[in-house]
Amino acid sequence: MSNVERALISVSDKTGIVEFAQALADKGVELLSTGGTFKKLQEAGIAVREVSDYTGFPEMMAGRVKTLHPKVHGGILGRRGQDEQVMADNDISPIDLVVVNLYPFEATVANPDCSLEDAIENIDIGGPTMVRSAAKNNASVGIVTDAADYQRVLDDMAANNGALSDDLRFDLAIKAFEHTAAYDSAIANYFGKKVEGQDGMSNLDFPRTINLNFEKTQNMRYGENPHQKAAFYTERNPAPASIATAKQLQGKELSYNNIADTDAALECVKGFTKPACVIVKHANPCGVAVSLDGITTAYDLAFATDTESAFGGIIAFNRKLDAATAQAIVDRQFVEVIIAPSATEEALAITAAKKNVRVLVCGEMEGVAASGLDYKRVNGGLLVQDRDLGMITEGELKVVTKRAPTEAEMHDLIFAWKVAKFVKSNAIVYAKDRQTVGVGAGQMSRVNSARIAAIKAEHAGLQVKGSVMASDAFFPFRDGIDNAAKVGISCVIQPGGSIRDEEVIAAADEAGMAMVFTGMRHFRH
């Protein structure tokens, strides 16, 4: 290891850079810098040399060309113990440390008012070139792309008499390659959606190529099954109030299935504005309720839907977890995960008595869900679609039967429809007074899903008569409505769109049922 004698600093994000540069200068490191970074360090009274002075070549083209020079890249790429003579012949001094972060391309294009010209001017050229050069030559050169690593570098230099350890240089190089890969991916994704037409530049719905960039959050003991290896990765800028940003306060490490099921429960409960509880088992809601009396009552009602399936389930709330609700849960059932926007200290003291209960807080839920894309891996390919954010209001429903729903039925219809969206297809949901009465999930036959919902309700001792029924897709035959009438369903919400809609509507009219069409399907596979 050789000492760090010369460092080149050129950063867009100047967080902590003055302090870091001062610490390097105090260690006797010669500093080179460019543009705004040079000015900031100079104003702070730090001894620093401008790169243009070092190269003898001025910055030009409004800053587009600053560091693209052999004296810079030769100093970074020069192999110690091999290229010294070439460097000396060309008056190239070795650069031992490169500190660079890049123009804020992602933040720039995230602005809806960003023009193509703005995007182009925020494509960094010299920065990534220096980063890659330093990372390539990590055997001799340190590369820092993250302000969070400044102290690591200083501590390592202090521990190694002014040099950087091989391990740290290699780790920083990996991080640098990840940094430039993510940067180039963002650029490719942005331009990959652009298409030039008669009216100028417009966006494609989907880019020509997709470059995904996720960071590993944790390794897991195993995947969906014990023989599968697994890890959890998150987006670089995940949506707030999501499983990716949730903070675990208590309990053992989350499993692969815990994360998948908690995501399903959390996204479902976000759909309700009144106090709500969602209980999920194997990615399906097995009990959901809304109560103006608060989340304790909502939990009581959700649990009552299917007490057997709730065992070992995931419970999500859209309000702060309080002591009364926490006590009701631990007294009544075994639970894998509880997630809520926040939790009281009293609630946490209660759940802490059950050491295996995982408690997560996700922050306040602003809006229903973040937009974006959904991905499904298939052998040799990737299916990509918009996230299913579709939701209907009462005014958008089409009454297709002679009888219209009552006000109470309408509330229950919209409630049941929100739940059905998160039930695996074929999905049937029975609900009454904004409580699920029975849930039929994942059957190949819609009629069988309806039968299962009725069996679940009977087993739970809940009254189906007078309940509403939600179906995630249309009824292809009238038998689904005939069976619903037999168990006492009073009202139905479904997308409509079958070639036999008239027969289905006639069946509802014959039974005196009300039925509304949403015009929107919610398949979930």
From Swiss-Prot:
It catalyses: (6R)-10-formyltetrahydrofolate + 5-amino-1-(5-phospho-beta-D-ribosyl)imidazole-4-carboxamide = 5-formamido-1-(5-phospho-D-ribosyl)imidazole-4-carboxamide + (6S)-5,6,7,8-tetrahydrofolate; IMP + H2O = 5-formamido-1-(5-phospho-D-ribosyl)imidazole-4-carboxamide. It holds the Pfam family MGS. GO terms for molecular function: IMP cyclohydrolase activity; phosphoribosylaminoimidazolecarboxamide formyltransferase activity. PROSITE patterns: MGS (PS51855). SMART domains: AICARFT_IMPCHas (SM00798), MGS (SM00851). Its EC number is 2.1.2.3, 3.5.4.10. InterPro entries: AICAR_Tfase_dup_dom_sf, Cytidine_deaminase-like, MGS-like_dom, MGS-like_dom_sf, PurH-like. PANTHER family: BIFUNCTIONAL PURINE BIOSYNTHESIS PROTEIN ATIC, BIFUNCTIONAL PURINE BIOSYNTHESIS PROTEIN PURH. This is Bifunctional purine biosynthesis protein PurH. It comes from Alcanivorax borkumensis (strain ATCC 700651 / DSM 11573 / NCIMB 13689 / SK2).
